[in-house]
Amino acid sequence: MFTMAKIKDGGTYLKNHLSANDYYSEKETVIGQWVGRGAEHLGLRGEIAAGDPAFEALRKNRRPGSSEKLTPRDGEGRVRFFDFQCSAQKSVSIMAVTMGDTGLLAAHDAAAALAFGELERFAARQANTYAGRANQRTSNVVAGAFRHTASRALDPQVHTHFVTANATWDLGTKSWLALTEFEMVSAIRYAGKVYQNEMARSCLALGYDIEHIRDQKGAVTGFEIAGVSADIRERFSKRRAEVEAGIAEFRAEYGREPTPAEIHTITTETRNAKLAEVTTPEVLAAQRSQLSSVELAHLEAVRTQASAQAGQRVPAPGRETQSLAASISHLYERQSVVPGHAILAEALNQNLGEIELRRLHAKANETGLVGLTDEPWVHQKFATVEGLALEKWAVDFVDRTRGQCEPLGGENVQLSPRLSAEQRHAAEAVLVSQDQVVCLRGAAGVGKSTVLREIYGELANAGVSVFCCAPTSSAADTLRKDGLAATTLSAFLSGSLNHEQENLRGAVIICDEAGLTSNRQGAELLAIAEQHEARVLFLGDSRQHTAVEAGDFLRVLESHSKLHRVQLTAIRRQENKAYRAAVRCLAGGAARVGLERLDDLGWVKEGRAGYLRGAVDDFMRLSGDGRSPGQVLAVTPTWAEHEAFTGELRARLKAKGVLGPGETIAAHEPLKWTAVQTRNARNYEPGMIVTFNQPAKGFKAGERSEVSRIADGSVFVAGPGAERRLPLRSGAFSVARTRELEVAAGDRLLIRANDRGSGVLNGEVVTVAGVKAGMIETADGRRIDTGRFGEFSHGFAVTSHASQSKTVEHVVVVAERLTAKAAYVACSRGRASCVVHTPDKAALLDRLPNGNREAALDFLGAEHSLAKTALDRTLAWAKALGGRATMLPKAVREVAERMWRRKHATLEAKWAETPHQGWNHHIGHSTNIHADRGPSLGL
């Protein structure tokens, strides 16, 4: 793996650290090597010893061999070096150093050099203009590579420091300029996966067996050499333990996670300033003394077996094509636009040790992805043909159906006198609209639901069939509580309402919380509207949270189509004028200003390590010591904060007698895998729980089973009766882990999946009236059999995603960090107040990313016409949809076919008619797809 730290002085760094192997021996030094295309440009080659004048010149920002400044700026506090550190797996370090396998050291050197060479491609300098900050890629660095074999705690730890000067050669200006690390850091996962894959390949070639290491969610994080136990690896990780202890102390003092810069400080402060005076033989002897005779013999056997197998294995067939297909499917399930380096990183991660990098790059040019930027493949951003077709078809549909219908609500509109002037105007604008698609847009709390009820009533009075849906169960439940018959959008699209399809002709389909709609869902909804000549009314706010699935559909329509938007602007939910003004700022995209307005009210509270206790204090105060929890909504952006806050709050509620005696329940933690992860048998472990959301061969909808074993690429689940093979490719089930959860009378539970048996819905919060022998009874009389259903967690707090569509009197936000969307959604839920508890107010305000995802059409604009070659390739990809056309709604398949059939001139003329939809960049400029055969991979 790679990490990066900034060095702002480094006066003794070469002599005291880089040239010593993390310990001091008078006769032993580490000799570095110059690396990088920038080093070659300066004529720097060969070895770097302690006191090297060229290294010292670079530290002082001087051209080696002269007193001339290298880059223009010499400011005090300037970053001197960026230290990119590439570390081997702990098992590799143990076998290479403690057990003396020098072949592994050579393999590390080669893998690290290759990985850093890939990272160098992302070197850049700042190219700021009046329009804002930008980076110009230079792809060259001046660096010294220093390989060490021990940690400061003298444990085996093979790692290489690539100490990179803060300078890069810019060909455009023919000058040396300061290096910006942003692009390199953004691609650091790719470089890390290049290293891991090459190292795994070398381990296999040297005769070792390897095993993939996974995190708690089942995702691959790396590999280790088989036979080196986790206990031994942990024993030789004392330096890591020291750093972790330092991080824990920081967390206890400040109540938040340290930043990367703070972790670097902790790392520096927790190591001995003075190097241990010891020789390498003494270090190795000390390491081996920590192993028992049995462990030492076992590791010797692992090495002996590897030596016997080295060079004798027949290399497995390359899995580059398979890995790329899996990577593309995995990433594009939740993103519309992905950079090339992220696709390559995930492809490597799919099959570590079985990928040849050059072949992977070659195969990447055959994927059939649509290039959106004019750059080399690894830097380019891509969309899939399907993704681009979905966006293009939806935008075209909205545009071509404008003004093509009768007024939505007829002529005689009778609205309630209780509506405000703005609300009345909005309702009238929707009801007189002659567009097939219209959007009622407004910030949180402007009264969209009030206007919707009026529109719904007018349509019903006019005899129009109305279908209401929402992307989430909780949002659909909110509609039902407002008196509107509603279902989830997925249920509407999946055909559960087929018995009512004849009523869709001429109907109105209302989609609430449309900002949570994905591109696929939105396009399918419009396709149904086209098929049945139905009208569509979207309600939502694209500044709030978006779908988990790929595509921010409402934002795409707002940005790229002529969508008729009826706007509500007057916020009504907040009773306090200053609170309302703060929410208005948040709704307008000024997240920092909005939070500062709340801070002016004294509602943003910094509690350092005690911020959770402060949040609990406010929750108890606002809820009458926990006896009226429905008055307060606690919002925790992360599940880690959710668990910590809930633990603190439940302890307080027990002390107040609000919670009764508890019973430990086996609850299920959903893993939220993508389809690719679900299909991969290697991701499963015995004891995992699978729940069928729809029927599949041999399984009924609602059925739950436990994974019993994994064998020969198949997953088997327990009875009843004999084991059954899990239909991995069915897409009919979800996967969860089991965890213990205490449940007591008075508890609130957040339901995380639908359960027909008990009648609870995903996103719903229920109150526990009692629990006995695994049976939970809710306050409204429903019964949850935890032997059959366990997808729930404590519900005194919800994530900001789950809070969307909710309204309460008081909000308590518990957050170390927030995105702009999370801040807006969470803080706008309250009528009377919103209190934000954070460990570090300045850190919270300084980091508020907007959370927007890119769409394919964001890269396309009218100021540039399409290059002929780019258009040819786009059309070829559209034609190649033939074998995969069933993946798309019929209407979208048709647009892909039309894209193929139309002549180039016709297409360009068509797109030129709508300037806001034109093309900013050439499409597919650097992808190598032959129009006569199309792409070789399914998308």
Predicted regions and their residues:
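Conserved ATP-binding/catalytic motifs of P-loop helicase motor domains
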Residues: 1-939
